[in-house]
Amino acid sequence: MAGLIPQSFIDDLLNRTDIVEVVSSRIQLKKTGKNYSACCPFHKEKTPSFTVSPDKQFYYCFGCGAGGNALGFVMDHDQLEFPQAVEELAKRAGMDVPREERGGRGHTPRQPTDSPLYPLLSAAAEFYKQALKSHPARKAAVNYLKGRGLTGEIARDFGLGFAPPGWDNLLKHLGGDNLQLKAMLDAGLLVENSDTGKRYDRFRDRVMFPIRDSRGRIIAFGGRVLGDDKPKYLNSPETPVFHKGQELYGLYEARQKNRDLDEIMVVEGYMDVIALAQQGIRNAVATLGTATSEEHIKRLFRLVPSILFCFDGDQAGRKAAWRALESVLPNLQDGKRVRFLFLPEGEDPDSLVRAEGEDAFRARITQQAQPLAEYFFQQLMLEADPATLEGKAHLATLAAPLLEKIPGNNLRLLMRQRLSEITGLSGENIGQLAHHSPPPSSMDHGASGVLDGDDYFAASAYYENEPSHAPFDAAPGYVEAQPRKSWNKDKKPWDGKKWDGKKKWDKGGRGDFKAPQRTPVSVESTTLNALRTLLHHPQLALKVDDAGTLAREQDTYAQLLVSLLEALQKNPRQSSMQLIARWHGTPQGRLLQALGEKEWLIVQENLEKQFFDTITKLSESQRFGEREERLRSVMQKSYSELTDEEKALLREHYSVAASSPSQS
C-alpha cells in the first residue's frame, strides 16, 4: 500500500509490543536474572552471548554487535523491509497500519516521544494509592478490601487505590492548564459534560484497580463502586494507550511472579484475579469488560502452551465459556491445550478459593477441568440430541464448520473422527458439511455485563520504504567500523559503503553494495566526536540548553547530535543501545553503532570540556550561518530598499572585511 506510516503509529506499536514475546516466538530464550539469553541468531556461536532485556525493550549480542528493538529484530531476523516488519508487528498486536501522504514536510530528523499519558496515568495511580492510605473517607474502601480477605502485600502488588467521593479530587490534584486538562480527558481520567463543558473526575467513591500493559506501565483503571451508584464496575474508556479488546488484567503481575508460566487461567473479574493471588495462585488474568477475543487468545498462546478458562457455573458463565471457545478454535494449533472449569452455582473464584483454600482449589482444577474437545461435544449435544437421526444431522451441521476453523491438523482430524463416531457420518460427508455455515445457534450470546466508560524508533516524523532525511554521506575524517559477519551469507546488514548522494537511498538494498577502500585517518570531526561522547556519557545532554537551535538543516551530523540531545533530555535513562536502536536500519543507526564501537581515545578529564567546546562551535556556526543568509538576502536589494537595521548589517560587514587580512 502506498503512503507513509505515521510516526505516532510506530511509537504506539512499539509501546504495545513486548520484545520478549517477539523474540521468543522465533528463537528459544532462557531466563538469566532479569534478562533472557540465547545463542545469537545472527552469527554462529556455541556459548550464548545474545541478550534480551524486558525492562529496556531491546536486544544485544556481545559477540557480533547486533542490537535494536522489536521492530529491528523482526527486520533482521525475518529479512523484512521496514513496512513489512511494521505490518508483521501490527498484525500481532491486532492493529491496522494507517498510511498518509507526504505533505511538504522537511527532512529534519525529529524524535518520537512516549505518550504523555503514561506519566499522567502513573501520577493518578499514585494519587489513588495515597488516598487509600490517608484520605479521611478511606474507611469504606479499607473495610471492603479487608472483607474480601486481602492483605496489604497483595494490595501493594496490584497497586490498589481509592478514588474519594466528590467531583474534582483528581482534577484539583493533577489539573493545570488547558493542555493538562486535555491530556486528562484523553487518558480517560476526566469526563466532560457535552452541554455545559464542565469537567469532573470519572472515578468517584470507588476502589481502584490499575491496569498495566505488558511492560508494567499503567494504561487504564477499573473501579468498583462502594456506594449504591451504577455501574458496579467501571472501566476506563478506549484511549490512545488502552485498547480493552487486547489487554488482560493481571497478566503483567502474573509474569512478574513467574516468567516460566506453563498455563494461564482466565477468570471473569479483577477480584477473582486478586483473590486467587492472595491464596497463592498467581497465574490468573481477566478480560476488561469484554468477551475473550481472538487477540486475547493469540497473546496468551504466545506466552504459554495451555489456557484454563474458569467461569461461574451459571448461565452467564457458560455463555462466556462458549464465546471463549469460538475465539480459541481459529488459534488452536497442535501442541496447544485449552481446558474449561465451571464452578458451583452461586460461587466464583473469589468466594470459592477463600472458602476452600489453595490446595482444594488446585485439586478441583485437576479433577474437574474439561478438555476443549470434551466440552465442545458436550455443549453441542445439549442442543442437538444424538439419540435421534434429526439430532445427529443437526449436530453435524453445527459442529463441522466449527471444526474446520481449527488450524492444528492432528486435532482437527481427531475431532472429525469423534464427530463421525457420534453421528455415523463418513469423514467425506463431514468434510462437505464443513463448507456450509451453521444455522444461528442459541449459544450466540450478547455482550458482557460490565459497563465501560465513555468513550523510538525513527529519525523522521514519518516512515516509508526509505528514511525521510537529508542526504547522509559518510563522515570525512573517521575510520569506519569493520562489518560484523552476517548470519545470512547472501545479505549483509552493513558492509561499510557510504552513500555518495548520486542516487536515492535504497533502504531495501542495504548491505548489497561493495565496500570501498578504507583509508585510515587519525582525526575525527568534532561533531562526530561529540556524538560518540554523548553515546558513552548521556548525562551530558542535561547540561545543554536550547538544543534545537544548534544545527542548520544542511548539517546532517549536527542534526543527528541535536536529535540525540533531545531524546536524552526527554528520557535521560536511555542506554547507548536504546539510542542506537532508534535509528535501526538507517545510515544514522549504522554511523552511531560504528561510533559506539570505536576505541575510546579521549582523556577522561577532557571529555566534558571537549564536548561543550563542540556545542559552542555549533552554536556559533549556526549564528554565523543565519547572519550570512541574511546578508546575502540584503545584498540582493538596492540600497534605497534597505531598512536601517539592514544598512547597519551591511556597514558592519564591510567594516569587518576591510579590517581583516586577505586570504589566498
Swiss-Prot record:
Domain Toprim: 262-344
GO cellular component annotations of the record: cytoplasm; DNA-directed RNA polymerase complex; primosome complex
Keywords: DNA replication, DNA-binding, DNA-directed RNA polymerase, Magnesium, Metal-binding, Nucleotidyltransferase, Primosome, Transcription, Transferase, Zinc, Zinc-finger
Disulphide-bonded residues: none
Top-rank EC class of the record's enzyme: transferase
Superkingdom of origin: Bacteria
Chain positions covered by the region annotation Disordered: 94-115, 483-521
Record-listed Mg(2+) 1 binding positions: E268, D312
Cofactor annotation remark: Binds 1 zinc ion per monomer.
GO biological-process terms attached to the record: DNA replication, synthesis of primer
InterPro entries named in the record: DNA_helicase_N/primase_C (IPR016136), DNA_primase_core_N_sf (IPR037068), DNA_primase_DnaB-bd (IPR019475), DNA_primase_DnaG (IPR006295), DNA_primase_DnaG_DnaB-bd_dom (IPR013173), DNA_primase_Znf_CHC2 (IPR036977), DnaG_bac (IPR030846), DNAG_N (IPR013264)
Catalytic activity, EC: 2.7.7.101
A Pfam family of this chain: Toprim_2
Binding site for Mg(2+) 2: D312, D314
Start-end of Basic and acidic residues biased regions: 94-104, 487-515
Annotated zinc fingers (CHC2-type), start-end: 40-64
Catalytic activity as recorded in UniProt: ssDNA + n NTP = ssDNA/pppN(pN)n-1 hybrid + (n-1) diphosphate
Alphabetized GO MF terms: DNA binding; DNA-directed RNA polymerase activity; zinc ion binding
Cofactor(s), by name: Zn(2+); Mg(2+)
Subunit (UniProt): Monomer. Interacts with DnaB.
Family designation: Belongs to the DnaG primase family.
Comment field on protein domains: Contains an N-terminal zinc-binding domain, a central core domain that contains the primase activity, and a C-terminal DnaB-binding domain.
Function, as annotated: RNA polymerase that catalyzes the synthesis of short RNA molecules used as primers for DNA polymerase during DNA replication.
The protein's name in its UniProt record: DNA primase
Name of encoding gene: dnaG
